[in-house]
């Protein structure tokens, strides 16, 4: 839906941030930011939603643009909306997670200066509130892995 938008009330920007884990859950894929804010800091791949896409489409597009991973399945974790989470202005992010083998072809693209797998036990400092986002993503993965289907 393209066009001119006028609103009576101010609107926050909306982003998607994606954690890609190895299947054994020992590592997560991070990008090193090429732009301010947090230039040269490690972060989850992600970015701003376009007006003509859904949040899931945004997550899939941003993941491809920054890492070269073409996701076919991402799971939504939830929204993060602290007022000061982004120094550029009011931003709400929706977090997603997925899985990829370490053998998956990755490449730092778009505004990612570098890309690397990081052990969850040895994470570097992360940009924005990405430590908090990653914690919630890990909780969600563990919860989903513990779900059982009642076949009665």
Predicted features by range, described:
Residues 1-17:
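Acidic, metal-coordinating catalytic segment for phosphate/diphosphate chemistry
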Residues 10, 36, 84-86:
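A short beta-turn/loop motif at secondary-structure boundaries
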Residues 12, 42, 116:
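Residues that recognize and position ribonucleotide moieties
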Residues 14, 38, 90:
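Exposed loop/turn and edge beta-strand positions of beta-sandwich/beta-sheet ligand-binding modules
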Residues 26-69, 147-152:
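Conserved Nudix-box catalytic region and its N-terminal flanking loop in Nudix hydrolases
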Residues 49-73, 78-142:
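Unchanged
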């Amino acid at each position: 839906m393209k066009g001119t938008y006028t609103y009576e009330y101010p609107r926050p920007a909306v982003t998607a941030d994606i954690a890609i884990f190895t299947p054994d859950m020992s590592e997560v894929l991070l990008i090193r930011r090429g732009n301010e804010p947090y230039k040269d800091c490690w972060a989850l791949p992600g970015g701003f939603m376009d007006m003509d896409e859904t949040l899931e489409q945004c997550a899939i597009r941003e993941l491809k643009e920054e890492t070269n991973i073409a996701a076919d399945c991402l799971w939504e974790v939830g929204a993060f909306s602290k007022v000061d989470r982004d120094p550029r202005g009011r931003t709400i992010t929706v977090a997603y997670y997925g899985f990829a083998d370490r053998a998956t072809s990755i490449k730092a693209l778009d505004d990612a200066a570098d890309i690397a797998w990081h052990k969850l036990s040895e994470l570097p400092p992360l940009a924005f509130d990405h430590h908090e986002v990653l914690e919630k993503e890990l909780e969600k993965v563990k919860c989903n892995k513990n779900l059982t289907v009642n076949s009665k």
